[in-house]
């Protein structure tokens, strides 16, 4: 009997089947994983698209509702958003500068001078603070330039010294007692470096009474101790200004004015004795004073329903000297004009021997409402002369031919009907030869 042994053959067959199964199983696993990944990716993309579409839909719905409620176009929302972003950035910049700027300035002050900028501190070495350092350097440069300018101005400013005086007003007697006590640190006006100072006193605006101290030879610190009395009523003293004019005496030429001190008596307490020092100010510029013609104050009022234009000449000040004695006899001439033709002319009273006349005189002109924009008003300050012709000092031109402050005054009057509008004006030159002279009053 023959026995057949199939064990080894079966084992070999099993091994072959196992190998084939393993070879077939590997591709199956790879295919499955790839499919799973593809499904996951597709799902994510689909979900992302859905979410984005939903967000866009919600945004569109909100935008439409807001636009319907506010009535604003789309570009307006874009503009407002841009402005909001700019405001946020500006606030952030200011906050950062406020927080860190103080710290830098504090450190600079502690270290002193320029050391805080160019020392070995961490704020300079750290690259993050380079921009802040550059900004501080720029500010420092500007501050240094400003300091240099101020120092240059201080060097150019000449010290004229100061003067000590005493004021005492007697209300019962109506008199002002002025004592010139002393002066010190006066500038040297002579070749030797000294001066021969004296003080001239008078009251503005009249300059009628002038008094002088004695001359003190070759000194920059004179002691005067001289007293003078001015008769001034109490109802007039508040409009006066006391002048201390300091001069250097010269025997053979014109005396040079060192400087002056002005005391407005309306701004001090006359009920008490005043004794104080005052710095001496530079003297007035004679050339500029000669060019100035003065100022005039008047009010304008127009009533459209009545067609009535009212001009009130109030006062004038600092008028140009026209007479030999250094004064003038001023009056004011008002001329209503249209198309170069004079419609009506009126004049104030004459104020004798003054450069600061007070009038408070009213004049009326009939001007219909349809003509008010076509007329001009020429206000001229004249100097009365008893023997010769009256000369013009200066004038203002208002109305349709006016310019600058005169035109603004006229427009303010028209914008405020029935209400008087008062204003000061600087007198301009009278260019027309025919207006420089006037007939007798």
Swiss-Prot record:
Show the SUPFAM superfamilies listed in the entry: C2 domain (Calcium/lipid-binding domain, CaLB)
Which Gene3D superfamilies would you find in this protein's record? C2 domain
Residues holding Ca(2+) 4: 323, 329, 383, 385
> In its keyword annotation, does this UniProt entry include Membrane?
yes
Residue ranges annotated as transmembrane are 70-96
Q: How many and how are cofactors bound here?
A: Binds 3 Ca(2+) ions per subunit. The ions are bound to the C2 domains.
Localization recorded for this chain is: Cytoplasmic vesicle, Secretory vesicle, Synaptic vesicle membrane; Synapse
SMART domains the UniProt entry points to: C2
The UniProt annotation places Ca(2+) 1 binding at 190, 196, 248-250
Task: Let me know which tissues express this protein, per UniProt.
Answer: Localized to regions known to be rich in synapses and appears to be associated with synaptic vesicles. Also found in some non-neuronal secretory structures.
* Designated name of the protein: Synaptotagmin-1
Top-down, what is the taxonomic lineage of the species of origin?
Answer: Eukaryota, Metazoa, Ecdysozoa, Nematoda, Chromadorea
């Amino acid at each position: 009997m023959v026995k057949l042994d199939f064990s080894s053959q079966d084992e070999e067959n099993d091994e072959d089947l196992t190998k084939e199964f393993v070879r077939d199983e590997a591709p199956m696993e790879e295919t499955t994983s790839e499919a799973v990944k593809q499904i996951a990716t597709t799902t994510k993309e689909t979900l992302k698209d859905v979410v984005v579409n939903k967000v866009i839909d919600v945004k569109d719905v909100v935008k439409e509702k807001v636009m319907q409620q506010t009535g604003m176009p789309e570009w307006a929302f874009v503009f407002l958003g841009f402005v909001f972003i700019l405001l946020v950035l500006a606030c952030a910049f200011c906050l950062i500068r406020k927080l860190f700027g103080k710290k830098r300035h504090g450190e600079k002050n502690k270290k002193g001078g320029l050391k805080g900028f160019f020392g070995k501190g961490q704020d300079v070495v750290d690259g993050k603070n380079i921009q802040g350092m550059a900004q501080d350097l720029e500010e420092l440069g500007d501050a240094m330039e400003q300091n240099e300018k101020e120092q240059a101005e201080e060097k150019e400013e000449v010290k004229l010294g100061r003067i000590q005086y005493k004021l005492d007003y007697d209300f019962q007697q109506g008199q002002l007692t002025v004592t010139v006590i002393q002066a010190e640190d006066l500038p040297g006006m002579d070749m030797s470096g000294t001066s021969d100072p004296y003080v001239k006193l008078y009251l503005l605006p009249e300059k009628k009474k002038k008094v002088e101290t004695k001359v003190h030879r070759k000194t920059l610190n004179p002691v005067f101790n001289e007293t003078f009395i001015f008769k001034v009523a109490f109802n007039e003293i508040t409009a006066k200004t006391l002048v201390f004019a300091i001069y250097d005496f010269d025997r053979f030429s014109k005396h040079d004015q060192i400087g002056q001190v002005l005391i407005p008596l309306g701004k001090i307490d006359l009920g008490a004795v005043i004794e104080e020092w005052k710095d001496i100010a530079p003297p007035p510029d004679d050339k500029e004073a000669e060019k100035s013609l003065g100022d005039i104050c008047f009010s304008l009022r127009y009533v459209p329903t009545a067609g009535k234009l009212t001009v009130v000449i109030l006062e004038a000040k600092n008028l140009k000297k026209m007479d030999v004695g250094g004064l003038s006899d001023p009056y004011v001439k008002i001329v209503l004009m249209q198309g170069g033709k004079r419609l009506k002319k009126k004049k104030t009273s004459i104020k004798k021997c003054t450069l600061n006349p007070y009038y408070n005189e009213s004049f009326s002109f009939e001007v219909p409402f349809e003509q008010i924009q076509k007329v001009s008003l020429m206000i001229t300050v004249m100097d009365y002369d008893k023997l010769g012709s009256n000369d013009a000092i200066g004038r203002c031109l208002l109305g349709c031919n006016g310019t600058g402050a005169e035109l603004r005054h006229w427009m303010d009057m028209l914008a405020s009907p029935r209400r008087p509008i008062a204003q000061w004006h600087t007198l301009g030159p009278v260019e027309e030869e025919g207006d420089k002279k006037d007939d007798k009053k």
